[in-house]
Amino acid sequence: GKTSNYTALCAKAADYGYNLIIILSGLFNDLREQTQFRLLKELAGTEKDLLEGIHIHGENYKKQWKIITTKEKDFHDLKYLKSIGDLTQPHLIVTKKNVTPLEKIVEWIDSTPSDIRKDIRALIIDDEADHGSIDTQSGEQWNSSSNEFETSESEINRRVRLLLKSLSPGFAYVGYTATPIANIFINPEVDNEVTLGPSLYPNDFIITLQEPDDYCGINQIFPANQESNEDSPYIIQVPELDADNLRLMVDEEKLDHTPIPDSLEEAIITYILSWAIRCSAGRKQGNKHHSMLIHVKHTTETMKPIVRKVNDLLNNWSLTIADEYERVDGPKLRGRFKQVWEKV
């Protein structure tokens, strides 16, 4: 619910007169594009051909947004962008926490005429605020040219702070993260605030978002009053023999001689059946994201043998089902799916 929460915050900010909203949406393009899409769908209402979201039609919608970035173009990709000229509409920017787009936004703000700039009321939302924004190089370093110690900051931290400085005093900065530990340890007092802008330490508040009624998280999976995992409806203990076989499967030399464990096969069938149930519920459910994670080792390279083994299994099942179970292993596969179906 993190994105939904700050989408609502953007809407409330616009209602209260904030006219420039900047979302710092992580370090990579895929997250930025995903966030841009969500905000166009759920905030601006410009994605009209969707099954979900809000849909704004007609001229009577008085708070129409001025969308600066697009799904395809981050801020630094935009050509011939004029300085801010009209603040009657709330402006929306979704950008990566990279040096180039942050520099371009500061240049764009600095190029705005002073009589308009003084009326900017900006909300900066830092998504994944513990990733990229933290000053990981904070401290003094020796400068051999000047023969003295100088403070230095990591590049993204510097650019985020310069962005806040360019908008000062008319801005609010709100960070969102599931893991705020690093943010708590940010130095609240910096010596270079005048030149680089304020510290990103959460001076004013740190709050936990309220869980929705249908939320399933750590408190539901591992409740405090639960004596063991055996009491949980969400956890199935992997048999020790299966766990040993999974560990063997990451070894290329032993892969061909190691079958996929029964518990993993059952989990894959359960996943396929659950997906079939969702698809049968209609297009709206079938189009939703649906994934399964198989996690044996922490590195991608060591997981590749298991990926190949699982893909071979799925390809074999697909051919068997396409032949309407007429292949030699057809009756056995059908019986296995039926067994899992009746179990779950």
Please describe what each predicted stretch is.
Residues 287-306:
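Conserved strand-helix element at the start of the C-terminal RecA-like helicase core
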Residues 3-11:
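Motif I (Walker A/P-loop) of helicase-class P-loop NTPases
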Residues 68-125, 133-163:
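Conserved RecA-like ASCE ATPase "motif II neighborhood" in helicase/translocase motors
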Residues 17-60, 178, 298-301:
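Conserved Walker A/P-loop ATP-binding site and its immediately adjacent core
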Residues 57-58, 120-126, 130, 135-281, ...:
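Conserved P-loop NTPase catalytic core
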Residues 36, 41-86, 90-92:
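Conserved nucleic-acid-binding Ia/Ib motif block in the N-terminal RecA-like helicase ATPase lobe
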Residues 302-318:
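Conserved helicase motor "Helicase C" RecA-like lobe of SF1/SF2 P-loop NTPases
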Residues 28-31, 98-101, 130-131, 179-183, ...:
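Conserved nucleotide-binding/hydrolysis micro-motifs of P-loop NTPases
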